């Protein structure tokens, strides 16, 4: 996904998977060399790296968000923040995003009543492509 869209991927430990060559290939990340991937020890280190890189607005994608992901207006450099597949984002992180960027910076993906959530990779793909679409796709081929 990152190689195809040009998005940078920032992972925060602890990871729920291995980044060794065999695991990465099995997960479909065998062209990781084409993507910008950084692993951070904690969210504070990730945040500092993103600030140094000139990150824009932060968006928290979370069940129970204030508005739908397709209602947001994304800009180049924005940060899409997803939690772990099982637990989502910590409440303190969601509160921090609300405080810094407003309640409407917490987004949700609509789904049918009674369903909990999409898996993480599908959610990331959906929101990333919407942000990319809004910014003209930037396709170079």
Regions found by a protein language model. Give the residues of each.
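Post-transcriptional modification and biogenesis factors for structured RNAs
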Residues: 1-141
């Amino acid at each position: 996904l990152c190689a195809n869209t040009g998005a940078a991927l920032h992972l925060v430990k602890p990871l729920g998977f291995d980044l060794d060559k065999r695991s990465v290939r099995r997960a479909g990340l065998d062209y990781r060399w084409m993507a910008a991937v950084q692993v951070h020890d904690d969210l504070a280190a990730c945040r500092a790296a993103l600030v140094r890189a000139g990150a824009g607005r932060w968006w928290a994608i979370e069940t129970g968000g204030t508005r739908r992901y397709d209602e947001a207006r994304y800009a180049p450099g924005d940060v899409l923040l997803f939690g772990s597949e099982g637990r989502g984002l910590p409440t303190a992180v969601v509160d921090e995003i609300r405080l810094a960027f407003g309640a409407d910076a917490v987004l949700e993906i609509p789904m049918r009543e009674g369903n909990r959530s999409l898996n993480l990779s599908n959610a990331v793909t959906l929101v990333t492509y919407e942000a990319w679409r809004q910014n003209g796709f930037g396709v170079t081929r």
